[in-house]
């Protein structure tokens, strides 16, 4: 069985959004959303914020504030602890593990004797006529005879070609496999929850980016409106600024939905009673761990990977099944014994009561000469052993390939992140210069928008690179069996 990992291709990780955290991050408030410049203007078409826009932005701001004020910041460790205890899928698989452990007993394997106790009662009522050779007929009526019996029987297979021993080993190995399956499910769950936790961090940062973008667009719209009022800018400039502001506002609303979806998914993974509970993370940024070298990770993978361990257990199980089939080549020896007691009470005749004790013991030896399918089953069992070995080799190669791919993606994303951090410095300086020139009237609105978009895109690329690197880190730790590092 190959392990299902949480890692996703970089193309799927990128959500296609362009909002980013601005260097001039400002908080979108109800007051500044409702602010309308030059209220004395009679042309309502050019009101900077109409009633619909004001209502939407006010709702966005109030819900964002409520979510941050009502929710207690939660760490990743707290989320994992809560989820590991409450998640329904994990609780089910733990119960299945307990069932497998309960089945791994000598009794279920047939190593212990079978003991049965029986008891019974019988009675009969009758009458008769006795005619002697001399004398009158003797009539007996209402005669009742009864009897009580009890016994204990023992049956024990002393030898069956070691089949019972193989059965016991098989049950114990199945119990170990069930434990490994539980571990695999726990590791998959931890990886999924950790990835979703940092996805929430990413989505929250992205929402802050869009709020900042709206604030920047609002400021630009205010400037354009004032210049339009005095005739220094055209109606086209005003309309373009309004279109850009509305576009940023729409992106902000869409991002709120994505953040809510991530929050709901986290509550589902943690099996929360209500999915509408406000939630926020203690971590405001995506922090990366320091990973071992590739060679060290590969050594840990060979030793600790749950799928690798399960493959070895499946190979052992195939060996046990072969031993079980081969046991039919040997004779069997069975021991049977019993002890009984019976008492009878007679309603007529010269005997009133009779008590009887009896015991028996026997040994049976047999050999199955031919059953029509023994040889084919043994050949198939040997092939199953070979297949288990091949599957283990195939899994080793697959895990090495996955590890190499993940390591390459991890290293590339780290270099990309370092490059984007340098790039954002230039983008911030470029925006600062553009903003200053725009205030002086030396820069057009389109050029100003382009500088703003360049900064936002640079910040977004950092956010995506951080999350992609984190997902690769999670997958590498999951692959090498070190996912529990997030519990520390």
Language model features with spans:
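Surface positions of alpha-helical coiled-coils, especially the charged/polar e/g heptad sites
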Residues: 75, 82, 89, 146, ...
